[in-house]
Regions:
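C-terminal and inter-domain tail/linker signature
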Residues: 1-145
Length: 145
């Protein structure tokens, strides 16, 4: 059975290395790493392909922004384009919630399901959720965040 404490530490380091600390990500990823992007129907095989995608991003990667991280203890982080907000999970499966800011000013919510094998990230399924305006018809039924 996996050691929850050490796996959580791996995932915390991994979340803080995303998306562009390529050396750290390489150390934290299993040799057979695969990442799926279900919304676009794409699969990334291997760290080298992941790195090439991010290094080729049109317009370059955005500048840093700070966010408060929620989880086992509160911390502040400053990372380029990506701010981890929360990590939950146990055993070999964890969820990372983050915010992404793109070079054109757009932003998205980011959720990654991370599966570990042999103490390294072997699989990641990533969802990108673009913010949208709430419909007026339910305005009196909800609170604005």
């Amino acid at each position: 059975m996996a050691d929850d404490t050490s796996n959580r530490q791996v995932v915390e380091r991994y979340a803080n290395a995303l998306p562009t600390d390529f050396d750290a990500l390489s150390r934290l990823r299993h040799a057979d790493f695969v990442e799926d992007w279900p919304q676009s129907g794409e699969r990334i095989r291997g760290h080298a392909s992941y790195r090439a995608i991010h290094e080729s991003y049109p317009g370059g990667l955005p500048t840093a922004s700070g966010q408060k991280v929620r989880g086992s203890e509160d911390k502040w982080v400053v990372t380029p384009s990506y701010s981890p907000m929360r990590i939950v999970g146990s055993g070999d499966t964890y969820f990372i919630e983050a915010r992404i800011s793109y070079p054109d000013g757009d932003s998205a919510h980011f959720v990654a399901i991370v599966d570990l094998r042999d103490g390294k990230v072997a699989r990641q399924t990533t969802y990108f959720a673009v913010p949208f305006e709430a419909p007026e018809w339910r305005a009196d039924l909800v609170e604005r965040m």
